[in-house]
Amino acid sequence: MSEFSDYYVVYQRVGEHAMVLVGHKNDTPRALTANQFQENTNRWFYFENGFRDEDTSQGIHHQLCNLHMSGRKMMVKRELYLALRHIEIAGAQWLRAVIINDDDTYHDDYHYLNFYENPVDEDYAYYDFVDFDKSEYKAKKYADYLPPLYTFKKVVLSPEKLAAVPLEKRLIWDDLQFTDCLVVHKSVKEIMEKYQPLDCRFTRIEEYQEDMGTRAEYDADGNLIC
């Protein structure tokens, strides 16, 4: 298998650990989704379960773990952060984060990976699309600062485009304009797996489908993939 196929999309697993993490209402992080926060990073950023009331009313209590995904937002505990912080990530920065659990317990040993600018432009993406038509993009924007998300059925990596960039500069990347996916190299995936990332799944980028992470997934025998 080609060295250029060793990439995985990281996304949220559907299950008991899954939380929709949002910035606390009295703090700044809601603006982080604009990918523009580049100020002093020595402060703390607070996040909480966006569906806390609904979950607790149904008796759902979330267990915090070493890695949490909420959409393409990734938060990792300090031990995993220390294992990843040496990696050069274009257009991104690590911010110190606090997750407020549903029982109002503050967990201040997390770091949030904030992409403050799009590291991949339209003319220099690392992949091509199959069954992709720019005229079919979703016209509705979620907010003024979010670009339209294009519809795709399959992503195919481009060995030529990848070869033009040293491996150490493309171990972790996120295309904010087209697929809106967090992508990691196999070597990074192996580091993450050592820390039992219960809240996320890894799927080879060429097997990734647009709605993964928003629905339950089943194996060939019809069993729920947990």
Name every feature range the model reports, one short phrase each.
Residues 32-34, 79-82, 97-102, 158-159, ...:
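Intrinsically disordered, low-complexity boundary segments flanking structured domains
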Residues 28-36, 53-56, 72-77, 140-146, ...:
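A broad, low-specificity signal for short, low-complexity segments enriched in glycine/proline
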Residues 2-59:
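N-terminal ordered "arm"
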Residues 34-53, 86-106, 226:
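Short N-terminal signal/transit or membrane-insertion segments
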Residues 67-124:
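Aromatic- and glycine-enriched beta-alpha-beta binding-site module
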Residues 64-74, 173-180:
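Extended, non-catalytic structural segments that build the interaction scaffolds
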Residues 2-7, 106-115, 119-226:
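Acidic, proline/glycine-rich low-complexity IDRs
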Residues 44-47, 61-64, 152-156:
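Short acidic/polar alpha-helix capping motifs at helix-coil junctions
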